[in-house]
A protein has these predicted regions:
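Glycine-enriched alpha-helix->loop->beta-strand junction motifs that scaffold or abut catalytic
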Residues: 42-51, 67-73, 94-100, 131-134, ...
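Active-site/ligand-binding-proximal alpha/beta "capping" segment
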Residues: 94-155
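Conserved, mostly hydrophobic/aromatic
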Residues: 43, 75, 127, 138, ...
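Active-site beta-loop-alpha junctions enriched in small/polar residues
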Residues: 1, 35-37, 55, 78-80, ...
Length: 184
């Protein structure tokens, strides 16, 4: 993943522009992560959904900037964020006028290195009971392990998740990022 500065970092702005072009050409919705205020200003109104990744959940200036738009936002939970911290991060977006927020449980940091993270399935019913936000689950990042994606997807839907987000590639083993947790 992008935790290492030596890992593939994605195509950045060029990649966002490619996605926008593909979305227009094939009339498909485009969701991608934006990591800077500059990117939000440049691409925020051109995307169907903006994703705020786990490392930026605490980037309050970035959250305020996406809050100024009407574009829906997927807000991923921080690696060690409590439910309250996650919901307060959503408030930064909401307080700027954007109520189109989708929360994404993507696993929290644990001590056992067997899986990349630990899927907090309890987050789903908690968010459903205590907020009006839709919640989706990312079992790919929660485990970092391909064979766990299907059973955790089923568990997430059973717990009440509004959707699932998974890493996919036509040839997962060739994926430049997150190959171990990518399905075909």
């Amino acid at each position: 993943g992008r935790t290492s500065p030596y890992a593939f970092q994605g195509l950045r702005d060029e990649g966002v522009e490619i996605l926008i072009d593909i979305g227009k050409k094939y009339n498909i919705p485009v969701v991608t992560e934006l990591t800077s205020i500059e990117q939000v200003k440049k691409y925020g109104n051109k995307l169907d959904i903006i994703q705020i990744g786990t490392r930026n959940m605490y980037n309050y200036e970035l959250l305020k900037e996406v809050g100024k738009l009407k574009t829906p936002v997927i807000l991923k939970r921080g690696l060690s964020a409590t439910y309250n911290e996650w919901l307060l991060a959503a408030e930064y977006i909401k307080n700027e006028g954007n109520n189109n927020i989708i929360l994404c449980e993507r696993g929290i940091r644990g001590f056992d290195p067997t899986t990349r993270n630990i899927l907090d399935i309890a987050a789903v019913p908690y968010i459903k009971k205590n907020t009006s936000y839709p919640i989706i689950v990312d079992p790919s990042h929660a485990t970092g392990t391909r064979y766990m994606i299907r059973p955790l997807s089923i568990a997430s839907i059973a717990a009440g998740a509004d959707g699932i987000m998974v890493e996919a590639h036509i040839r997962p083993e060739k994926s430049l990022s997150d190959a171990r947790q990518t399905i075909n």
